[in-house]
Amino acid sequence: MLSIIVFGASGDLATKMTFPALFALYVRKIIPEDFQIIGYARSKLSQEAANKIVTAHIPIDDTVGASQKALNTFVEHYKYVPGTYDKPESFEMLNSIIAEKETAPASECTRIFYLVLPPHLFAPVSELIKSKAHPNGMVTRLIVEKPIGFDYKSADAILSDLSKHWSAKDTFKVDHFLGEDMIDGFTAIRFANSMFEPIWNREHIESVRVDFREDFGCEGRGGYFEGAGILRDVVQNHLLQLLTLLCIEEPKSQDAEDIIKCKVDFLKSLHPVSKEDIVYGQYTKSANGKVPGYRELDGVADDSEVSTFCALQLRSEAPRWKGIPIIISAGKGLDRDYFEARITFKRREGGMFPTVDSSNVLVLRVYPKEFIALKGHIKQPGFSRQIVPVTLDVKYPEAFPDTWIHKAYEVVIADAINGKHTHFISDDEVRTSWKIFDDVLDTTGDLSPLPYAFGSHHGPDATLEFFKKRNLEWD
C-alpha cells in the first residue's frame, strides 16, 4: 500500500506541478494499484472544492491514456484533510486517516510525505510527522521542495533540523530541473561518446555557459520575488546544478552516490563569486510603455533593489577548468525565451583553412524545444572552396516520436516512490552552493541592480562590457 501525503495541497505549486505529475504516473502505472493520495493544508475546503484544485491543471489526452474516466478514477483515490502545521493533535488525526486504508501489515506499506511548503515549516512539520505519523516498521520518506534556505546560514539550520529526525536515506530534496530529460542526459552525452571526453577540458574549450532567458516578467509573483531575486530563484539551484553536470569528473557508476560525490567535488573547486564577477539588473517598463516595470508590480516596493537579471563568472581550481570562463546568465523581461547550455571550443590556429573565424559550439537546449546541436564547418558544395558554417542537430520530439518524454516532476516523484536519490540534491550540494554565492546575495550598495527596459536583448548595458572583458560575446 502506497500513501502519498501532499502538504500545502491547496497551493499553486501542488496544483500546477505535483498533482498533474501524480496523475501522469498513475496513467503510466508507475504508481501501484493499491494507493491513496491525501492532500493536507490549512485551507478549510470541501472534498468537492479540493478535487477541483487537483484536476484544475490536468489535461485530458486520450491518446496517452489520460482520459476523463482515468482522471475520475484517480480522484477517487484522493482525500483532502484540513489541519494545522504546528499542533500534534492535527498530525494524530492525519495519521488515523492515513491508516484507515492501510489494511496490509506495516512492513508492506509505504508513506511518502511531500512538503510543498515554505522552508520555515520544514523543521516543525517533519518533526511532527516523525513523532505522530511514522508507524514502526513502515517505510516512510520525506520530500522537501526548494528553496532550502535563504543563504548558507539558514540552509545549514534547516538541514541540521531535518537531520535530527530524518536520515539522509529517507529524505529527498527536490531540484526538479534534475528531472528534465535533457539535463538528465548530460552525463550520457559527455561520457557515452568517446569523441567528447578527450577534448572536454581547458586545452580545447574556450568557455562554458548556461543561459536562462525569459520573455515575461514577475506579474503575479511580485511578493515572492521580493524575497528571492533572480539569483536565489534559479541560479543558486537550477542553473548551478545543470552547470555542475557539465563540469564534473566522470563518476565511477550511474549510482546516485557516485554522481553526487563528483558533483560536490566540482562545487568545492569553485571560488565564492566576487563583486567583480557579477552584474545585476532590474527591468523597468517596456519601451512602448505597455508592460509595467518590476517596481510597478503588486507586492513590490517602490524602491526595490531586487534583481531580475544577473550575469556572473565562476572560477574553478579544478585542473580541467582552471582559467576557463564559466558563465551563468539569467534574466526576466528579455526579448527571448529559452534555457540552454553552451560549450564553445577553441578555434584551431593555422592549418589549411586559416580563414575560418568561428568556433565549434555544442548547444544543449532544455526548452522550449529540447535539442542538441553541434555547430561546425563544411565546404560549400560546387566548385567553390569556401568554408561555410553548418549546424548538425538532434531534436528530441522528432528523434523519439513514440517515446513518452516524462516531465520533470514525474521523474523526481517516481524516484522517491522507488527510494532512489538520482534526481535529488544532497546536503553537501545545498551547503556548498550557498557558500559560492553568499558574498553577493545582498543586492544593495555596490551590487544595486542596473536598469534595463522590459524586452531588452541583453539586460543592463553593463552586461556587454562584462562579456567583452572576458573576450566573450552576448548573443
Swiss-Prot record:
The keyword Oxidoreductase applies. Its main location: cytoplasm. GO terms for molecular function: glucose 1-dehydrogenase (NADP+) activity; glucose-6-phosphate dehydrogenase activity; NADP binding. Keywords: Carbohydrate metabolism, Cytoplasm, Glucose metabolism, NADP, Oxidoreductase. The active site is at H238. It is found in: Cytoplasm. The keyword Isomerase does not apply. Coiled coil: none annotated. It holds the Pfam family G6PD_N. GO terms for biological process: glucose metabolic process; pentose-phosphate shunt, oxidative branch. GO terms for cellular component: cytosol. NADP(+) 2 binds at R342, R365. Its EC number is 1.1.1.49. It catalyses: D-glucose 6-phosphate + NADP(+) = 6-phospho-D-glucono-1,5-lactone + NADPH + H(+). Pathway: Carbohydrate degradation; pentose phosphate pathway; D-ribulose 5-phosphate from D-glucose 6-phosphate (oxidative stage): step 1/3. NADP(+) 1 binds at R42, K146. D-glucose 6-phosphate binds at K146, E214, D233, K332. Catalyzes the rate-limiting step of the oxidative pentose-phosphate pathway, which represents a route for the dissimilation of carbohydrates besides glycolysis. The main function of this enzyme is to provide reducing power (NADPH) and pentose phosphates for fatty acid and nucleic acid synthesis. NCBIfam families: zwf (TIGR00871). Belongs to the glucose-6-phosphate dehydrogenase family. HAMAP family: G6PD. This is Glucose-6-phosphate 1-dehydrogenase gcd1. It comes from Schizosaccharomyces pombe (strain 972 / ATCC 24843) (Fission yeast).
